[in-house]
Amino acid sequence: MKCLIILVIFAIATTQIRAACNQQSDCPPGSCCKKPNSYMEGGCFPLLKRGESCYVKDNRIYDVYREKCPCGEGLRCHQFAEGIWQGQCVETS
């Protein structure tokens, strides 16, 4: 129970630090509007960096990303294997 309370407090604190958003244009360059989960409001988060885990397919619903931002400028999401939606941000070649 203590762990759950700590997680809820952390989620609320993290949400309040981020700028709220409802669409991509609400966020500054180098960031995206995403909802970390179904229960949280949208917030501006940094685009993914080289080596970070990403989604190969577009994961936007109504111009808000779900769970992960896309890879940053000059990067693309390289698919791990066919049939898997996740990949890793790598330099565009």
Swiss-Prot record:
Disulfide bonds join C21-C33, C27-C44, C32-C69, C54-C77, C71-C89. Pfam families: Prokineticin. Keywords: Disulfide bond, Secreted, Signal. The keyword Signal applies. GO terms for cellular component: extracellular region. Residues 1-19 form the signal peptide. Expressed by the venom gland. It is found in: Secreted. The keyword Signal applies. Its main location: secreted. Belongs to the AVIT (prokineticin) family. This is Venom protein 164. It comes from Lychas mucronatus (Chinese swimming scorpion). The lineage of its organism: Eukaryota, Metazoa, Ecdysozoa, Arthropoda, Chelicerata.
